[in-house]
Amino acid sequence: MKRGIRHFPRLWRASRLARRWYYARAGAYPDWRSLIEPEAELWQSARAGAQGGPRVLMATAIGSYAHAATLESALSAALTFRGAEVHALLCDGSMTACAECDASLYPDLSRFAEHGPSQDLCRNCFSPAESVYRQLGITVHKFSEWLGPDDRAEARRIANTTPANEIQAYTLDGLVIGEHAYAGTLRFFATGALDDEPMAEPILRRYFESALRVAFATRRLLKSIQFSSAVFTHGIYVPWGIVGEVARQEGVHVSTWNVAYRKRRFIFSHNDTYHHTLMSEPREHWEDVELS
């Protein structure tokens, strides 16, 4: 059935959006409240004991990544029991494009070039993940809280005036911005090159503007609140690649993760992404491990 629907782009889009709407309301996210209630006193004691401990930022960012909100909220609970003061970072509609967007959702690409995800994907993104973290009593930071009007204007100015052929190599104060914006655009089109993609330039500029916004907001957050570590998925694209760039520059330890190739396992990489650490990890760390 899925293959059949894909032959009808507008029907495919409608089914995807309907599925997102349903999952945001029906069981795709953990119900921490029901887990905490039987041991409420224990959890409150753990939370109180964690205040003032090492601060860890769960930069989930994209709330509709239910699997990310699930794992990162579980890590939040585990770290709280171990004395860490955990905060979360979510986008509340501030990004102009992100890793949740892809061309198959937009049969009319000009619509995305003009509006981005603001008229559809953003509607069911922030609230479910915020609810997950609020159930745990974790402080939730929104991109909009750390992004001022001047930041938005500057991001728009840079994105509109930088020559298209210079975007990929663009850096800001030593931060690799353009590379992640370009990678995000490639991901949007599910391609290895943008040369033959319709609307490639305006969509690249939209990802570029979004990357700049994420950089401005994340930098202000990390300069205002001292975090010892930041945890998030992938470590590339927009927003996670940009969050990683800023965190490393600000001296915050970065831990990225992705779903592993073995069932019910995850790959964690420190201060880099699994794309690199899978190639550079010393073989002696695993070659003699007895696998079940």
Task: Enumerate the language-model features and the residues they cover.
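Conserved N-terminal ligand/cofactor-binding loop architecture of enzyme catalytic domains
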Residues: 1-55, 59, 78, 82-212, ...
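A short, glycine/small-residue-rich beta-strand->loop->alpha-helix junction that serves as a flexible
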Residues: 61-71, 232
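Short, solvent-exposed amphipathic alpha-helical segments in soluble enzyme
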Residues: 73-76, 247
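Short, well-ordered alpha-helical microsegments
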Residues: 67-68, 72-73, 238-241
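Conserved nucleotide-sugar donor-interacting segment of glycosyltransferase catalytic cores
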Residues: 214-269
